[in-house]
């Protein structure tokens, strides 16, 4: 069976670390294939102050991990951290779209979008929406609303937000390494 390759990159204040793992359906845990770690010389307090250094640090860390793993990666999960990251709770509500009142994946997407529609300053953006629970016609604390029946669907979510310039700068540094 062919392994699915995943990669994670952590760009921190003190080091840039990369891990490459192989995952297949028969193995419960990912198998570590390669790691890379180099000192971080372009970040301070979670913010990039030298893009060229950060680009080089990411490239060096990824190259170490690729060399150890014997594979070339083309996508990665990248950590985003720093003092600019904030969270807040939000709620959204919609009317279920189907005539038979069965909640679909589309309804869940719509209610999550409704919960994500908040006023943010122009320099901040939502990074992630984490559903906490749903309420269906006053039935609270529903973990998975898919396939259930109801007229009114509410969602309580945790919104993770950050400063847009920091997010874009990190993405630019990662993407510069192809």
Where are these regions (language model features)?
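Nucleotide/phosphate-binding catalytic cleft detector across ATP-hydrolyzing
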Residues: 1-15, 19-178
